[in-house]
Amino acid sequence: MAKMSIKKILLIVLGVIVIIFIIAGIAGGESKESGSSVSSQEATTKTNTQTANTNSFIKPGMYKVGSEVKAGEYVIEATNNNGYFQVSSDSSGELDSIIVNDNLNKGEFRYIIIKDDDYIKLQNCRMYLSADKTIQPKSLDKIPPSTYKIGKDIPPGEYKLKATTQYAYWERSKNPRDSIYGIIANDNIDDSAYVKVLNGEYFKIVGIEATLVK
């Protein structure tokens, strides 16, 4: 009887060991699967991050120029009617630090030049390198509100402007960084006007529809 009891005990012990190994194997498998899932998620996150950084546009946010985005000329596109961008000399948030800023509606574009150590803030906007983005209106008979680079987006020449909203404004500028000193000519109109623009200028129209005359 004692020998039978020992055998039974040994069998029970062996059974317990086998069960432990089975449980450990299952747990190990789950751990590996879980680890693979995490790695996959990490890889996906890294891929998404790389895609976001190397994609054709820069998402809304605040960036330091030179470390997060390259200096250069960019095109900003509003993704809804509350689009806003701001270029600042520092991150103090003070009005004196603002170099240039503007509001724009969905589908409108603005040009901007940013330099190393600037800060660029994008709200409801996305930003493209100017070389990668051309703003081509469907027709030169009905050019919608935006900022256009003459010779790149629309041809030089004389344009007839027609006010489409109560606030109608046009502006010719030498560059899109100097919000005041870069302006060549500008005006508010109540109904219509003619404006001649030259190659390399930036032509901004707000609440206006433009038509190429010649």
Regions found by a protein language model. Name each.
Residues 154-166:
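Surface-exposed interaction/gating patches
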Residues 5-30:
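Membrane-embedded alpha-helical segments of small multi-pass membrane proteins
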Residues 1-3:
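Juxtamembrane low-complexity tails/linkers enriched in Ser/Thr-Pro and polybasic
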Residues 51, 55-56, 79-139, 165-214:
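Primarily secretory-pathway and cell-envelope proteins
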Residues 25-67, 72-73:
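N-terminal, intrinsically disordered, polar/charged segments of Gram-positive cell-envelope systems
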Residues 69-72, 153-157:
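Extended extracellular/luminal ectodomain segments enriched in beta-structured repeat modules
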Residues 139-140, 145:
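Short, surface-exposed polybasic-aromatic patches that bind anionic ligands, especially phosphate groups
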